[in-house]
Amino acid sequence: MNDLPEPTRASVAGNIERWTKANREYGDAHAQRQWLAEHITWGQFGVREVDIGSPLGAVAGLDILEAGCGVAYLSAWLARRGARPVGLDPTPAQLATARRTQTETGIEFPLVEGIGESLPFPDAAFDMVVSEYGASLWADPYAWIPECARVL
């Protein structure tokens, strides 16, 4: 992360601080319920997928990166539908909650500590990148969008 511009480093540090607090106040207590929900909700308005149809289409057999996974409920949902997700997040507390929830639910997939602005994956590593409430809202779009394109 030291090779990133100072504004990006400061933004990442602020996001980690905010999401550590959010995890303590909400995410940690609700992770298992979110992981096991039959239908996911999208974005800050909580739009139910069942009401809008799946914006992702068929995901079985796809390698999917969730950029800014938080407690990784979307990655869990993808795994339950036969995808091979990888959850990426910069916040250790949220990843710890996700790992605990993996143990509780038996739903396994890789969880990686990292940032959308500098993805730790090789070129063309994924079939799809999703960001339900993560990188798309909190990361520098001039950095994370090209990074996501690179790994597709």
Language model feature labels by segment:
Residues 1-34:
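N-terminal, positively charged/glycine-rich alpha-helical extensions of SAM-dependent methyltransferases
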Residues 28-29, 48, 116:
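Class I (Rossmann-like) S-adenosyl-L-methionine-dependent methyltransferase catalytic domain
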Residues 32-62:
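Conserved alpha-helix/loop element of class I SAM-dependent methyltransferases that forms part
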Residues 58-59, 123, 145:
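A short, aliphatic-rich alpha-helical micro-motif
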Residues 63-118:
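Class I SAM-dependent methyltransferase SAM/SAH-binding core
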Residues 117-128:
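A short acidic, Gly/Pro-enriched loop at the edge of an enzyme's catalytic core
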Residues 142-152:
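A short glycine-rich, Lys/Arg-flanked "PGG" loop and its adjoining helix->strand segment in the class I
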